[in-house]
């Protein structure tokens, strides 16, 4: 009993020496720690945003198989960009497309862009073939995007200059061939009879899928084509070599190739905004502005929402694979902690100039973060 009393006295003496406990001070310390944690989280997200933007620039160039961004000036773009229906329709698609709502479906995308449409502008022929002493129009080079995909559609687009009176126009598309014994240097592809009314000029499309298929099978037979569109007075209305004021009216090929559908699976995660205090793994908004990059070679979109993942991962929170938690429980020292990463990515459609001056409309996979999780 005496020993117990001595112990109590010693305990009371220690409390007196230690002094009173200030509960408000502890509360302030806790609040300061929480504020410091929030500031660190904001700084972390800011650094993550910057890193994500740089990674996106590298990804886009890599997925488009470009070593560097094409060096195309705004003036050159104005001259090269066709003012034609198919291209205007593609650009209009970007104007009306909103951010698609995520339904939890996760595509198994390939790494590189899967091309849907290629708009090919004419180039100078390496063979320097001439017809009647004049440079021919037009010669088209085809990239691997066309050569190694299944061809769905190939349209040649030509622009006919306006007429002052109602006129019947006879259009001919000729394929250049090696000179024959009788001197023949071309064979017909298509002939058209068009009725034009006074006013503005018109775009006319011609199906050249069969010709393109033959060229792809036998590249040496591709010597180019000749375009003629004569009115009743013998005046050629086809714009083959644009004159001043005819920028964007050069003939071009619109080629469509197949795109293989992919499987999908389900996934879910948290969504946050830039003001969120959520510490767990979460998806945050991030807008990529190509004009801010100085990337004028991207025609559309000029910007898009890419998003990024940030936050802490506990072993019981949003793990991508169910066995991750079990592995850690079995061997906590031998397994690294889970990381906050994208678990669902979706593609973006892009209209752009490649390094050869061709206009490409393609789908670039895994460019938008739709879901985040721990794995």
Curated annotation (Swiss-Prot):
What is a single molecular function from GO for this protein? Answer: heparin binding
Which UniProt keywords are given for this protein, alphabetically ordered? Cleavage on pair of basic residues, Cytokine, Disulfide bond, Glycoprotein, Growth factor, Heparin-binding, Secreted, Signal
* One Gene Ontology biological process: positive regulation of lamellipodium assembly
| Removed propeptide positions | 19-266
**Cellular compartments annotated:** Secreted
Q: Which GO terms describe its cellular component?
A: extracellular space
What does the entry's PTM section describe?
Answer: Synthesized as large precursor molecule that undergoes proteolytic cleavage to generate an N-terminal propeptide and a disulfide linked C-terminal dimer, which is the biologically active molecule. The circulating form consists of a latent complex of the C-terminal dimer and other proteins, including its propeptide, which maintain the C-terminal dimer in a latent, inactive state. Ligand activation requires additional cleavage of the prodomain by a tolloid-like metalloproteinase.
Q: Which cysteines are joined by disulfide bonds?
A: 272-282, 281-340, 309-372, 313-374
UniProt xrefs under Gene3D superfamilies: 2.60.120.970, Cystine-knot cytokines (2.10.90.10)
Q: Can you tell me which residues are glycosylated? A: 47, 71
Q: Where is the signal peptide?
A: 1-18
What is the documented function of this protein?
Acts specifically as a negative regulator of skeletal muscle growth.
The family line of this record is: Belongs to the TGF-beta family.
Q: Which PANTHER family match?
A: GROWTH_DIFFERENTIATION FACTOR 8, TGF-BETA FAMILY
Q: What is this protein called?
A: Growth/differentiation factor 8
- Which species? Taurotragus derbianus
């Amino acid at each position: 009993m005496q020993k117990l009393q001595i112990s109590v006295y010693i305990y009371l003496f220690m409390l007196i020496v230690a002094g009173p406990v200030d509960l408000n001070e502890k509360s302030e310390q806790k609040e300061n720690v929480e504020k410091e944690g929030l500031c660190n989280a904001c700084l972390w997200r800011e650094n993550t945003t910057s890193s994500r933007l740089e990674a996106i620039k590298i990804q886009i160039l890599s997925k488009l198989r470009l070593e560097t961004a094409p060096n195309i000036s705004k003036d050159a773009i104005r001259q090269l960009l066709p003012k034609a229906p198919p291209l205007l329709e593609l650009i209009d698609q970007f104007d009306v497309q909103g951010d698609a709502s995520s339904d939890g479906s996760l595509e198994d995308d390939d790494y590189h862009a899967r091309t849907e449409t290629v708009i090919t502008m004419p180039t100078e022929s390496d063979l320097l073939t001439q017809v009647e002493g004049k440079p021919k129009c037009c010669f088209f080079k085809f990239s691997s995007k066309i050569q190694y995909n299944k061809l769905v559609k190939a349209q040649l687009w030509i622009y006919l200059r306006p007429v002052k009176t109602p006129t019947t126009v006879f259009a001919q598309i000729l394929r250049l061939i090696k000179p024959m014994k009788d001197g023949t240097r071309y064979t017909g592809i298509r002939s058209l009879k068009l009725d034009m009314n006074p006013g503005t000029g018109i775009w006319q499309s011609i199906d050249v899928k069969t010709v393109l298929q033959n060229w792809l099978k036998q590249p040496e037979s591709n010597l180019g084509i000749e375009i003629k569109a004569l009115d009743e007075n013998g005046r050629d209305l086809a714009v083959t070599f644009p004159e001043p004021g005819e920028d964007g009216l050069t003939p071009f090929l619109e080629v469509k190739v197949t795109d293989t559908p992919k499987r999908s699976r389900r996934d879910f995660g948290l969504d946050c905004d830039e003001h969120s205090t959520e510490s767990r793994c979460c998806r945050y908004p991030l807008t990529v502005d190509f004009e801010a990059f100085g990337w004028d070679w991207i025609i559309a979109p000029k910007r898009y929402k890419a998003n990024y993942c940030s936050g802490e991962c506990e072993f019981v929170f949003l793990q991508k694979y169910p066995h991750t938690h079990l592995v850690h429980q079995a061997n906590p020292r031998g397994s690294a902690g889970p990381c906050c990463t994208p678990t669902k990515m979706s593609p973006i459609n892009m209209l752009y100039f490649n390094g050869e001056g061709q206009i490409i409309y393609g789908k670039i996979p895994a460019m938008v973060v739709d879901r985040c999780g721990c794995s």
